[in-house]
C-alpha cells in the first residue's frame, strides 16, 4: 500500500510539472461531457482546473536554469582556445586578424547569424593552436578560415552557399572545393568533432531567458550584445578571457547603455549567477571601453536622467560597434545585399582519403 501511494505521488508530481503545457480548453473536456439530454455540461464544472493550469512550475524552471549555467561553466574551458605564449607571435597575430576580418565580411555579405561567425572563429583558433603555422605558406590561414566558416555555416545556417561561392569579399586566395573539403575533414578530426562549443552567446541566451519575463528590452539587449561581441572577436587581446568573463563584461556594458530600472541589481545578479572572477570582468570591461573609445566618451557625457540623451547615445554609438577594420568598412559599401547565390553545377563528391594523406595534399599546394 505504501508503495502504491509513493508511485501515485510520483506520477502526480510529474503531471504537475507538465500542467503548464496544457491548453485551457482541454481542461474542461472529459470523455463523458455529454449529459442525458445530449448537451455539453462541461461549462457547469468548476473553474478550479482551469486556474491551476495558468501557473508554470517556476521553482523547477529555476532549478533547470541553475543546472544549465553550471554545465556551461564547467564545459567552457574544454573548447576554449588559448594561445598562451603563441600570442606574442606577430606573424600568427597578423594572419589571424586578416583571416577573421574576411570571415566577418562574408558574414555580413550573406547575412549569416552572429553565432555562425563566432563558431567559425572558435574553430579557427582551436585548429591553429594545434598546428605550427609555416611562414612560407601564408595561404594556410586563409584556407583554414574558409573551411572553418563553411563548417560553422553547415552547423548553424539553414542555407549554405557552395564552397566556391563562399570565397567572396576580396578573398586573397581562391581554393578548389576539394581542397576546402579536405581541410574541413582535417579540422573535424583535429577538433574531435566537437563542433558545439560554449560561447559568449550561450550566456547571452541564458540571461535573456532568465530575466526576460520581467524585462521588456531583451531583444534590444541581445542585439547589442552580439554586435559588440562581433566587433571585438578578431582582437587577440580578448582571447585571454573565458566566454563567461567576456559575456559578463559585455552585458554589463550594454546594461549601462540601456539603463533598465534595476541596472545595478541586474549586474549583480549576472555576476553572481555566472560565478565569474570580478577582477577579470573589470579588466575585460576596461579593455572593451578601450576598444570602443567613442563609447567611453559618450558614457561620460550622456545625462542619465534624460531619455533623449540615452537615445542620442544609442544612435551615436552604432558606428563604434561595427567591425573596427578599414577593410570591413570599405567593403561594406560595395557589398551587395545578403543573398545566397546558387550555382547550377554541383560540386563533385570528394573521396575520403586517410588523414595523413589528406594533410600532405592540403599542405602541398593551395590550388
UniProtKB/Swiss-Prot annotation:
Xref: InterPro entries:
Cyclin (IPR039361), Cyclin-like_dom (IPR013763), Cyclin-like_sf (IPR036915), Cyclin_C-dom (IPR004367), Cyclin_N (IPR006671), Cyclins_cyclin-box (IPR048258)
| Region described as Disordered: spans on this chain | 324-347
GO annotation (BP), single: cell division
* Similarity field: Belongs to the cyclin family. Cyclin D subfamily.
Q: Which domain of life is it from?
A: Eukaryota
What Gene3D superfamilies does the record tag this protein with?
Cyclin-like
The record's gene field reads: CYCD3-2
Q: In which tissues is it expressed?
A: Expressed in developing vegetative and floral primordia.
Subunit: Interacts with CDKA-1.
Q: What does this protein do?
A: Promotes divisions in the guard cells (GCs) after the guard mother cells (GMC) symmetric division when in the presence of CDKA-1.
Q: Which UniProt keywords apply?
A: Cell cycle, Cell division, Cyclin
Q: Where is the composition biased (Low complexity)?
A: 324-335
Query: Which protein are we looking at?
Result: Cyclin-D3-2
**CDD domains per the record?**
CYCLIN_AtCycD-like_rpt1 (cd20543), CYCLIN_AtCycD-like_rpt2 (cd20544)
